[in-house]
A protein has these predicted regions:
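An anion/pyrophosphate-binding glycine-rich loop and adjacent beta-alpha core
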Residues: 58-134
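Central beta-strand plus flanking loop segment that forms part of the substrate or channel wall
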Residues: 37-65
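C-terminal catalytic lobe of FAD-dependent flavoproteins
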Residues: 106-236
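Short beta-strand segments that buttress and anchor functional surface loops
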Residues: 1-6, 207-210
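Core beta-strand elements of the Rossmann-like FAD/NAD(P) dinucleotide-binding domain
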Residues: 7-18
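Short hydrophobic-aromatic micro-motifs
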Residues: 21, 93-98, 206-207
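Acidic, Ser/Thr-rich low-complexity intrinsically disordered segments
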Residues: 247-274
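Flavin (primarily FAD) binding-site architecture
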Residues: 21-37
Length: 274
């Protein structure tokens, strides 16, 4: 490995038996640099997130929950609009969104050349064909990008009919890179979740795509362990440790009511919800 300190410019060379790439939008370029065959055909489609924010105390105090609506036809699942109570810099606030924005950056502080720099001979066709096979999403994104402040506040009025434009401001939030994956026919398919791409020899794995944070983290890491350490995870020591961390590991909660109740009780207790 060749690791560069972005602040000092210092370059360090390391040797590792296993490498995991969990760099958000930066994972795809790193995966491509690895040169593994399994990375061929993968591309990325960057989408920025925006929110309407209100911090006026008299408005914020009227709402203390998260309320979901329905995603527009063709929109990705994580675009489901919702009105949410948050704490920003110690102050309560209301957020409404998300609204999608187009960018060529893979990270919020990335380069405008991230997208073009990720194009390879092996993923060019999938990346060019993906808009054709995802016209609903393409139309949705174009509509989102060209929305005015008045348009966004008008969407908010489905949740909060008395919303006024002056009380809300638009702020940038996260950045995600949707997976563009090659199909069997050689075209491109846009994926809305996350995916583990792992080297055949188990020395490297990368987490690509976008998801609502911790909701997929545990499952993704279990996938990495099973694919990159297939022999070790079968050992008694690893099996014991896995079941200590995940009591339901390797079992079906659908078919085992007693186990389901036990897991649910453990979860409620751990999260202090009971």
């Amino acid at each position: 490995l060749r690791v560069k300190n972005q602040k000092t410019g210092e370059v360090t060379k390391l040797e590792a038996g296993f490498v995991f790439l969990g760099a958000g939008g930066g994972a795809l370029p790193l995966l491509q640099k690895s040169g593994i065959d399994e990375a061929r055909g993968y591309g990325g489609f960057p989408v920025s997130g925006q929110w309407l924010v209100c911090q006026k105390p008299d408005i914020v105090k009227e709402h203390h929950s998260k309320v979901y609506g329905k995603a527009p036809i063709g929109a990705p699942p994580m675009s489901v609009p919702h009105l949410d109570t948050r704490i920003i810099n110690g102050e309560p606030a209301l957020l409404f969104g998300p609204f999608a924005g187009f960018t060529t950056r893979f990270l919020k502080q990335g380069s405008i050349f991230d997208l073009i720099g990720s194009v390879r001979a092996t993923n060019l066709r999938p990346m060019l064909s993906v808009s054709k096979s995802n016209m609903d999403l393409t139309r949705y994104l174009i509509g989102e990008v060209f929305q005015s402040h008045a348009d966004r506040v008008n969407s908010l009025r489905n949740f909060f009919p008395d919303a006024r434009e002056d009380d809300w401001k638009l702020q940038m939030a996260g950045q995600r890179v949707q997976i563009i994956k090659q199909t069997e026919e050689g075209g491109g398919k846009l994926e809305f979740g996350t995916e583990i791409v792992a080297a055949k020899d188990g020395t490297l794995a990368a987490l690509l795509g976008a998801s609502p944070g911790a909701s997929t983290a545990a499952n993704a890491m279990i996938d990495v362990l099973e694919r990159c350490f297939p022999e070790k995870i079968k050992s008694g020591q690893w099996q014991s440790r896995m079941k200590e961390l995940v009591p339901s590991y390797g079992q079906s909660l659908v078919d085992n009511e007693e186990l389901l109740n036990s897991v649910r009780e453990r979860t409620l207790s751990t999260l202090k919800l009971r």
